[in-house]
Swiss-Prot record:
One annotated Gene Ontology cellular component of this protein: phagophore assembly site membrane
Name by which UniProt lists this protein: Serine/threonine-protein kinase ATG1
Gene assigned in the entry: ATG1
Reaction(s) the record says it catalyses: L-seryl-[protein] + ATP = O-phospho-L-seryl-[protein] + ADP + H(+); L-threonyl-[protein] + ATP = O-phospho-L-threonyl-[protein] + ADP + H(+)
Compositionally skewed regions (Polar residues) per UniProt: 468-478
Species of provenance: Cryptococcus neoformans var. neoformans serotype D (strain B-3501A) (Filobasidiella neoformans)
Length: 988
């Protein structure tokens, strides 16, 4: 079909339905069911069998080269993983504009919707067995019922235990492959009804099958999730991630505990509006997890609305929700806890049902020594736990990590794996009709689709668990997709950097990259409906050997992965700076009279710090423009873009909650503006509106709270943060007496802040240049009809457009595109380095404030921070968050060679001084003064030896910079005299 007609049809359609059927290979594309930052999800079906599938179309235009590489290596991981509790990648295709992932379709939505709807999801109803107690329940017109859950609180206990066991199976399998999920949450746990085959093989009748989704997208998630503070993900994050500390696989166990708590109680264990508040609540709990039924019992309330949580589940939750990873239950203990024993297979006995309360089956687990120890230890530790006041969130302070309660004793001698399938029933086979509901979380982990690159051989460090056995079902269909029930607990630790690295080294997790191999003559590829030409056909699955050990086919031979042992590091300086700013603000509220060693105010000029916009007031309409920023690590759109509403899913009453923000608007971002001439209004050059400023995710989250509090007090955190967010430079006005030490500190910090700001401003200009070049390259290289967010499924249209593009191309245009790409990368390189140098000055300033504050609080009990010091702290906090976020995004666009562009700073200083001179001649004295000041501070930054890698500035450069500063200082002094005379004031 013509591409113009296809594009016009997409523009006219609402996105939920299509007037024509489009195809990808052997698949027919149906209605859109989800949309993400750079992916659109469609429901479709196989053209011959009409088996429903989900097609995720990922736009290559929105992917940077690094994100594209991550996506491709993620595909290589997905195509060799076969497990009934992990969503399957059925097929994949790619063209010049899109990558298409054909995945299972799960019709039962996700666990979060299941909990909210109390299991009443249309596709999850079932016909009760004759003679069972459920047959007495009222049915619908088709004679079906939904699984009965309590009207309030958590899910039915049997469903909770079954879901937990299925989740544990998936985690154990991933762990055996040296993979971490790192984003376990209800939105990533998809549900679908069990097939007749699965029920016949022992799956509990009426309970949905749980599948883990998006597990491979999490290597870069922690940094992104900090930007998703308001989207819910941090509610299930381990505290070590919230503290910006390095973490290992035990972070998944915290998330499992949080999910188990929500299944048992009906809400997350800790709730907060941002990750700082969430961390405070976790620390304040002091490992004392209190359940609703315990609160009612302690308060002697007669209201018995809370459903009692079984004691063994309580003990498991408390063992998992330990703040310190070393105190948290380990994987072996978790897999052997026995909480889900007896609930992974259908019971042959008559069910006992209560519609009001769930049955407490923990009594049947009395023979488990481990559970008895967990319950006893937890009950003893509860009596000793005394809630304490949460400390200020200073990450460097030991008070942030208080000692937890006595850890639960664990019997590690028990070797039997309770996770394995009971030997009385065969292992269920993969059904031939996969279903999958794909959410809009975007892939971010991976290498080339065709062909994957080879890698070095793995080195096992421990033997697999001999307790895991599996046998193939005699009723398996022809060529079924193999199922791995519970992966062995083999600790194969594979590192792309070599096994000999130091334990303390921190490396980027290396994804599994299977080499390209053809079909093995000795082992036929199980049929999954995969085209012979598909990249998936080259990747044999992981299977279980006759001895119960995992066997990797040739696709995984020689692969390497450091996921099992590597740590992930998130910028800890962020939380330290935000915590210090919070503490300064809290200290500034104490009603005490400060000591003063002198009564004079500082005579330093602060004109360069005066904001163009007036102070923010309660009715300032620009506050509403401060917007939420998408996660920079997951998106090709910069972190300062605006969010637009997400389209509703069509044909689905229970769409999945988005795990990433919706699609974003295009460039240019409002925070970056081209530098106009100095003859224009000063605000155009040196000031921007408060609403256009973007700070980091934390600052924006706090600012949203601050907006509601502005006007209540001149010294509230809300006022300070909102003002700091609206200022491009600190506005230090001496309004109170202060001692000499604080005066000297503020003078030093102001100097560092000025240097940080001018470098930040120059980095913004380079980032703007990079985005404009990217738009130019995208416009010149994208054929007509292939733009937009909706992928062109018509192969004929794509081929015609590509042919037309080739006819128009020439050698000169190719050279032009290469030049644009080189300039684009160079601009990104400059922006990254300049942002990092600006961050260095900010961190240096905050360190000085931190040392001063610590010395003062050690000497004077209850020392009060001045309003000036608090204002400076809030400005540093806001600027750090914004700079850090932009640097992270710019880094995804930059190359490998990053050098400090001192020549660029020098040229900018000279050009700025020239424009200031022109403004002075034209009579715009205020603009001229700001230009001279900016030029001087650019040169001052070049004279600071800390910006150079070797820590010293060449002598000839130092002489040149100092010589250049002399005439600029002279002009600035003369200009200030003119300003003083014109305003009737004495010279400053």
């Amino acid at each position: 079909m013509p591409d113009s007609n296809a594009q016009g049809s997409r523009e006219k359609e609402s996105g939920h339905h299509r007037s024509h059927k489009e195809r990808i290979g052997n698949y027919v594309v149906g209605a859109e069911i989800g949309r993400g930052s750079f992916a659109t999800v469609y429901k479709g079906y196989r053209s011959k069998t009409r088996v429903p599938i989900a097609i995720k179309a990922v736009s290559r235009q929105k992917l940077t080269s690094k994100l594209l590489e991550n996506l491709e290596s993620e595909i290589n991981i997905l195509k060799v993983i076969n497990h009934r509790n992990i969503v399957a990648l059925t097929d994949c295709f790619k063209n010049d504009t899109h990558i298409y992932l054909v995945m299972e379709y799960c019709s039962g939505s996700d666990l979060s919707v299941y909990i909210k709807q109390r299991g009443n999801i249309p596709t999850l109803d079932f016909v009760p067995k004759a003679g069972s107690s459920m047959a007495l329940l009222p049915t619908n017109d088709e004679g079906k019922i939904y699984w009965p859950h309590p009207p309030t609180g958590g899910l039915d206990e049997r469903v909770t235990r079954s879901f937990l066991g299925q989740l544990a199976q998936a985690i154990k399998f991933l762990r055996a492959q040296d993979l971490m999920h790192r984003d376990i949450k209800p939105q990533n746990l998809l549900l679908q009804p069990a097939t007749e085959t699965e029920v016949a093989e022992g799956h509990p009748y009426g309970i949905p099958v749980l599948k883990v989704a998006d597990f491979g997208f999490a290597r870069i998630l922690p940094a992104a999730a900090m930007a998703e503070t308001l989207c819910g993900s941090p509610l299930y994050m381990a505290p070590e991630i919230l503290r910006y500390e390095k973490y290992d696989a035990k972070a998944d166990l915290w998330s499992v505990g949080a999910v188990l708590f929500e299944m048992s109680v009906g809400r997350p264990p800790f709730r907060a509006n941002n990750h700082v508040e969430l961390l405070r609540r976790i620390e304040k709990s002091n490992d004392n997890i209190v359940f609703p039924d315990e609160k009612e019992r302690d308060s002697k309330s007669s209201d018995e609305t809370s459903i009692p949580v079984p004691s063994d589940i309580k003990a498991l939750i408390r063992a998992l929700l330990k703040r310190k990873p070393n105190d948290r239950m380990g994987f072996d203990d978790f897999f052997n806890c026995g909480v889900w024993d007896g609930h992974m297979a259908e019971s042959t006995e008559e069910e006992s049902l209560s519609l009001d309360v769930s049955t407490d089956s923990s009594a049947g687990l009395g023979e488990s020594d481990r559970i008895r120890q967990m319950v006893a230890s937890t009950e003893q530790s509860k009596d000793r736990l005394i809630p304490t006041r949460a400390p200020q969130p200073l990450a460097a302070d030991a008070a942030l990590n208080p000692q937890p309660a006595v850890p639960i004793s664990r019997d590690t001698s028990e070797g039997r794996s309770r996770l394995s399938t009971p030997p009385s029933r065969p292992t269920p086979t993969r059904r031939s009709t996969p279903k999958y509901y794909v959410g809009d979380a975007t892939p971010s982990e991976p290498t080339a689709i065709i062909p994957p690159s080879p890698s070095s051989a793995p080195t096992p460090t421990s033997a697999p668990d001999p307790g895991l056995t599996t046998q193939q079902s005699p009723t398996s269909r022809a060529n079924p997709r193999p199922i791995i029930t519970a992966a062995s607990s083999a600790q194969r630790r594979m590192s792309g950097k070599g096994d000999g690295r130091e334990a303390s080294s921190v490396e980027e997790a290396a994804p599994i990259t299977p080499p390209f191999t053809g079909p093995s003559p000795t082992m036929a590829r199980p049929s999954r409906g995969i085209n012979e030409g598909s990249p998936l056909a080259a990747a044999p699955p992981i299977t279980m050997g006759p001895d119960g050990r995992l066997e990797r086919s040739s696709a995984l031979e020689g692969s390497t992965s450091g996921v099992g042992t590597d740590y992930v590091v998130v910028e800890k300086q962020t939380v330290e700076i935000n915590a210090l700013a919070d503490e300064l603000d809290q200290a500034s509220k104490r009603p005490m009279i400060r000591r003063s060693s002198r009564g004079s105010v500082v005579s330093r000029p602060v004109s360069s710090f005066k904001p163009i916009s007036p102070n923010i007031t309660k009715n300032d309409p620009t506050l509403g423009a401060i917007s939420y920023s998408p996660p920079f690590a997951l998106s090709s759109t910069p972190p300062f873009a605006m969010q637009v509403p997400r389209h509703a899913s069509g044909g689905n009453s229970f769409p999945r909650n988005p795990s990433i923000p919706s699609s974003l608007n295009a460039f240019p971002p409002t925070t970056i503006s081209a530098s106009p001439s100095y003859g224009q209004d000063a605000a155009a050059r040196f000031g921007v509106s408060p609403g256009s400023l973007q700070t980091g995710a934390l600052a924006r989250a706090l600012t949203n709270t601050a907006i509601r509090l502005i006007g209540t007090s001149a010294n509230t955190a809300a006022t300070a943060i909102a003002r700091a967010t609206a200022k491009r430079r600190p506005n230090i006005v001496r309004v109170s007496d202060m001692d000499a030490a604080e005066d000297d500190l503020l003078c030093t910090v102001e100097d560092l802040a000025r240097k940080a700001f001018v470098l930040f401003e120059l980095a913004d200009e380079r980032l703007l240049a990079q985005t404009q070049l990217a738009q130019t390259a995208r416009t010149s290289s994208t054929p007509t009809g292939l733009t937009g967010t909706t992928p062109p499924f018509s192969m004929q249209a794509a081929a015609a457009a590509q042919a037309g593009s080739r006819r128009k191309s020439s050698s000169s245009s190719m050279n032009s595109e290469v030049w644009i790409l080189r300039q684009q990368e160079a601009a990104a390189n400059d922006a990254v380095v300049l942002y990092m140098k600006s961050l260095a000055f900010i961190v240096k300033a905050m360190d000085k404030v931190k040392r001063y504050w610590k010395n003062r609080t050690d000497v004077y009990d209850g020392y009060v921070a001045s309003q000036e010091l608090n204002e400076m702290g809030q400005w540093l906090r806001a600027r750090f968050n914004e700079t850090f976020e932009k640097a992270e995004w710019a880094k995804t666009q930059a190359g490998d060679t990053l050098l400090f562009p001192d020549w660029l700073v020098h040229d900018k200083a000279r050009d700025t001084s020239r424009q200031a001179a022109v403004a002075e001649l034209q009579g715009d004295l205020t603009t001229a003064e700001q230009g001279y000041e900016t030029s001087l501070w650019l040169l001052q930054a070049l004279l600071d030896e800390s910006v150079y890698e070797n820590g010293s500035i060449p002598d000839e450069d130092k002489v040149a910079y100092e010589r250049l500063m002399v005439p600029i200082k002279t002009r600035l002094d003369a200009l200030r005299k003119k300003l003083a005379e014109s305003s009737g004031m004495t010279a400053r």
